Amino acid sequence: MKYVQKASSSYSSDTALALSGNNTPDIIYVEDKHVKSWADAGYLAQLDNGDFTGFDFENKNSEVWESGISRYRFDPETATSGEDAPLWALPKDIGPTVLFYNAAYLKELNIEEISVPEDKLADYNTANGTSYLAKGYDSANRVFNNRIAMSWEQVIELAKEMQKVEGCDYGYYNEWWYAYGWSVGGDVVQYMDEGYYKFTLNDTGKNYIVKDDTAAVTINGTTYDAGELISYADRDAVTAADKESLNELPSMYDAFLEFVALTAKEGSVVGKTSTGEDKLGYGVSMGANSLGTADAEDYFVSGKFGMFVDGRWEVPTLRENMSESEKWGEGSWNVAPLPVYKEYDADGNVTVHGAAAGHSGSMGLAIADGSDQKEAAFEFIKYVVGEEGQKAQSLAGFAIPNQIALSKDEEIFLQTAKDPVNSIVFVEAAEYQRPGDWWSLTDSSWIDEWANYLNYTVRENKATVNELFEKYYDSTQEKLNQYTGY
């Protein structure tokens, strides 16, 4: 086999150009965000049409993360994805996002750090004579539990605490809205029965989740179990009787406002809520334009960020620049789950919660449709995505194995003798996270204009969220209509 290395910065564009020519490579890397456009252009060979054997394409044995397989399915005829859509690549890895936090800052602030799953907290309290609540950050007791997701409010509380440490400019950095919108059942785009995609980032309709003490509820012909979010398609069919079994959650629009408020100056107006009130900024994060050409991990390593959201790929860098550094040392950082929408009663018990949510990235391996060595190419791909190839890749700590069993192996992936000790959080995140909005359609042209305005104007305190939608809603919907010829 001949391996040709390409610069990562131009890999996708260089590969797309090569695939459009007559002298194509045999095997290619394909990011999840490009698989739809490359399949639509006829660049890739379909893997599950019977030409290739020896792999569980339908993942019947659930050996591979389902979100790893499903993100490489796409039907060019209908411009949709689904379990019956053709498969164009196999996942080389999966990279969930989590919350990285500065554990040294917690110690400096006299905040106790514990690592106790919620179902073991009662036993922990009994054994230690404590009465800690099931919270990610319990400000009353000054305890941070890295095994329980913080609520939106707790993130703000802890971020403001961290900003009291000299050198910590911002307590929190998160450039993605996904954990906020998806946690309450919202999304930026929805496929409608009429055959078009609808821009729903500003949707003000309330969302619903099945109560934890409810066995199941059927709405509009769909059965939902306890803890499941009601889909956008079924939401309008919820009756007064159904609501007895459901908890109401914020709208996608209000969740988006919460995200944008992170970077807004404290007390400044971010926009109007769905009920007409002013949403005020928190001043705990930095906008993308302010970050400039630097990376979030650079600010984290320097101590300017107390917490930031990113993927497993940051681990080798942080091990080298923090765990092995004189300034920080081992145990100076760790990881925790992404925040989740939660409401509490007066005693600190959760009464309403959203779903754990977030995005993950993945790199796939595909066969060029123009290859004349397809069978040999597939044998190589099977090796890389198989047990032996995944073991070799995972020891570097860069990404999670595509195979579930390997990802839970102490030596191969968890590696709890090294930072981050709480690496099980990555495995748990891989179970529920999905691709970002860049994957939704064949390209990102419907995203680019409003996203640039969001990141470089709205999140820099130069415009409100309402101005964003006034300026870009109609043009974005027009672009979405073009994908299906609506």
Model-derived segments and their meaning:
Residues 2-73, 108-109, 299, 306-307, ...:
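Extracytoplasmic "Venus flytrap"/periplasmic binding protein-like
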Residues 15, 155, 162, 299-301:
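Hydrophobic residues within well-ordered alpha-helices
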Residues 30-34, 174-177, 293, 310-315, ...:
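Beta->alpha turn/N-cap motifs
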Residues 32-97, 116-128, 212-216, 334-338, ...:
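Hinge/lid segment of periplasmic solute-binding proteins
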Residues 154-159, 194-293, 338:
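Glycine-centered hinge/linker elements that transmit conformational signals in sensory
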Residues 259-264, 292-314, 366:
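Glycine-rich, aromatic-lined ligand/substrate-binding cores of catalytic
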Residues 418-478:
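C-terminal capping/gating helix-and-loop segments adjacent to ligand/active sites or protein-protein/ligand interfaces
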